[in-house]
Amino acid sequence: AVVVNPSLCIGEYDARPFSGRAVLAFATPRIPVYVRHTFNAVYTGDVAVGHIRAAERGRVGERYLLVGRNVTLQEFAALVARTAGVRPPRWRVPYGLVWAAAVATECAARLTGTEPLLPRGVVHSLRAGQLLDGAKALRELSLPQTPLEEAIRRALAWFRQHRYTA
């Protein structure tokens, strides 16, 4: 078997937004804060190509990280905000405050029967961070590297076209 592990996928066709939630959140002027966090984001189209190339060229028993760019949450939020034409978040908040907000949104979600805006698992992941190196996938699979700015632009265009955001 050949295994592929994509990082946070950003792009079109996120019909039930999961990773797209981050794009949608920072595309509105309602989110004035961010936490210190570094993660990796990759364009969904690059992930699709990576899956195909792993099936065609991948070595049996190997694992390939299908990744794009390592970025701080502050940088990501600024890219999304600039693309959406809104003000980026300005204040960094401590994890304790974010954890309390996560608990509150989970309680509210339970009462309303909806998905929590900020699950505690997400806050736990934020604190851990995620710096990834996809050199093997670049080298062996020739994984495309679409710029994160383009992935965000395409995601926002798709979300707007399908009325997820203004």
Residue spans of the language-model regions?
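NAD(P)-dependent short-chain dehydrogenase/reductase
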Residues: 1-3, 7-40
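Residues that recognize and position ribonucleotide moieties
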Residues: 2, 40, 69, 91, ...
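A hydrophobic C-terminal alpha-helical subdomain
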Residues: 31-35, 39-46, 95-140
